[in-house]
Amino acid sequence: MSPPRVSRSWLARTATAAAAGIAMWAAFPPRNWWFLAVLGLGLLFAALFVGAPRARTGAWVGFVFGLAFFVPLLPWIGVYVGPLPWLALAAILAGYLALFGAIATVTMRLPVPPVWFTVSWVLVEALRSAFPFGGFPWGRTAFSQVDGPLLPLASVLGAPGLSAGVALFGSSVAWLLVVLVRAYRRTSTGTTWTPIPDSEGPVLPERSSGVVRIATTAVAIALLAPIAAIAATPASLDRNIATTSARIGAVQGNVPRLGLDFNAQRRAVLDNHVRTTMAYGGAIDSGQTEQPDFVLWPENASDISPLDNADAAAEITAASEAVDAPILVGTLIHNPDGRPTNSVLVWDGARGPVARYDKHIVQPFGEYLPWRPFFRLFSSYADMAGDFRPGTGPTVVDVPGRSGTVTVGVATCWEVAFDRAARQSVREGAQMLFVPTNNATFGRTEMTYQQLAMSQVRAVEHGRAVVVAATSGVSAVIEPDGSISRQSGVFTSDVLTGRLPLHDDMTLATRLGPWPEVLAIIAAVAGLLFALRSRTRFSLRPRRVAARATGDTKELDGIGD
């Protein structure tokens, strides 16, 4: 006995959702197959649109997509703490995609479904990037596009706009194909169209042609939008427009060992960075490389605070004198309230610390542990989490360079995933961005490459050069167009040098700030409320009537599964 049609439809949707999630994962670094994100969201659109499934089916489709995407994306979470945190986080994030599936299924019954698919996608990405515990933006669609032609959208509408561009492109192409296939089937079967009163919403040939035109227009807009973005903000993509520049050296000193306890040898980590910087100073003295305006060390380069430890201060001073330039030092500072801050000190060999930045967005389950007594029940690693205090004040530091003071925006490690971090720095006058990071606790996983892509998006979003200094790799020098001009390996010592353009202008994305995302969220919520209030009868009834008029039994069977 053959299985019921609904069961076959459910299995087909499930398989399509799983394939879509895997395609989305493959779009992310280190593969960078950006086009698979477009394909993945196109498949997800088809799974949620064809046959007009119920909201609960849409939720299931979204959940399957989320699992197929996040499970292979995030294994670095559990590389040293076991699979439970990794799989639990993947399941929670898949829950957000289940919410998306339910919302999109309902709102896509409104006219021009790709628009509602897109704004619903932006809504749910915003939700999981903010809640709970400050959110988890990892895996945002925008971060899969560093090698793709849609990347310039970030300079106009920010990272949320880039995510929206991918969603609109994929869903519009899928919608156009669905419409064309339906039109072909009706034509090939020689269907005779029976007039139906307009109040019932007939799907007449003229209306079908109109839908094709709308779908084609949506695809064209999605393709032309990046070109318009380049025209709107040429400075953000031209590395030669800046009138001033600074020569930098980014030091990757490496760590003595991998794992969660890499920093048990804090002095060895500091010594590694001092030794590598001293060698850099020797190369400068011998004329092998040019004198830098300043040098950048990564996060945790000196977890022995030079403000409290005279030996650490002396080592950093000696390194600064060796290169005859200030060093931006990633360190931990112990505060009077007993809670440390993850800080960057601008250390001048002659004057000591001249500026300081304390990390504003501290990482849950790493730098602090919410609900500590509760999570202690599930993992023996819970007590290894810190109790860091979030920083306040400016997100920029003024660095005295050889050619004048340079205003550097700092987004330490985890912070680069959040839109507000880099945006605040640029609005406060940052001429370039600095991302000190420590990825040693994640071993040789894909995490470091996924994070590097975030810095590339930020470069384009704000039209700024970005320097990523990593304790153990990957360190990189990123141009304002998002391209990587220099890059280190992992678990090796290295020094990356280069002259970076310094920009004072702002891209449209920086000026607009969060407003494009806010408007998309408002549109998604309004569309959902309108669709729920209308109980979707205006959408489903015309399709039932038209299907009965044309004798399309497959269409009738597919509606509402």
For every predicted segment, state its role.
Residues P137, E290-Q291, T407, G429:
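Short loop/turn motifs at secondary-structure junctions
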Residues A232-F365, V396-G404, V410, W414, ...:
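Soluble catalytic regions of membrane-associated enzymes that act on cell-envelope
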Residues L89, L93, F262-L270, T445-T448:
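Flexible, glycine- and charge-enriched loops at secondary-structure boundaries
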Residues Y80, L84, T118-V119, S302, ...:
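CN hydrolase (nitrilase-like) catalytic-core segments centered on the catalytic cysteine
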Residues S2-P234, G443-R444, S455-R458, A470-S472, ...:
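Membrane-embedded alpha-helical bundles of multi-pass enzymes
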Residues F28-F45, F69-P72, Q252-G253, T289-I304, ...:
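Short, conserved active-site loops that position catalytic residues or coordinate cofactors/metal ions
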Residues I77-L84, A130-A159, A318-E321, T341-R423, ...:
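Active-site catalytic loop in hydrolytic enzyme cores
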